[in-house]
């Protein structure tokens, strides 16, 4: 329910006559949909509550999830508007991917969140709602940098990180936040307006961060690039997302005057 409130508040097209008059359906992709609880809830909310013509595609790597979800959609009479694709987030072929309006990724583990962001960016998605889960990849990358730099003073930031890295729970929480801050920064450079918010109470799950990004096409500023370059130099590594979107990022850097 809380997620749907954020979706409603975030929709760049919620009051757009182009959609509400049914001249054009709102196209949504749910990456890593699992048993599609969110997929069906999103469709029902937009179609039945908001009266918006909506198409939703759920993507999951498991064939059994696809078959189960298709059966549920048929039972509900929604099979025309709600469909499912089996495949990885990186490689699944999405029908109508050139017209994706909203991309959802709820609790995609580790780099699956990054892979979802990559696909959303390359689809030029208008709205991205991603709730990250575990953050192992950057933990490993930064820990390697901390270890290799422990006897060096080359980085102002890595010195205190050595102390934090001694305590697993402190290191985990710190790098979780660094990971999501870096993701938000990359999206800003690529022309998105980004908010990072809590979308459900912490008593339900500790994984309650929502990255909410709306595409505006805003130009990447020198200040944003300075922040990005400081992240790389301070932590001594790239993130998964900066490597995956290297081409897109560099094209934005060239445009900075």
Question: How would you name each of these model-derived features?
Answer:
Residues 6-22:
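Glycine-rich helix-loop-beta junction characteristic of Rossmann-like nucleotide cofactor-binding loops
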Residues 13-14, 49-53:
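Inter-helical turn/loop segments and adjacent helix faces that build the functional surface
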Residues 24-34:
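Conserved class I S-adenosyl-L-methionine
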Residues 35-51:
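Conserved SAM-binding loop of SAM-dependent methyltransferases across substrates and taxa
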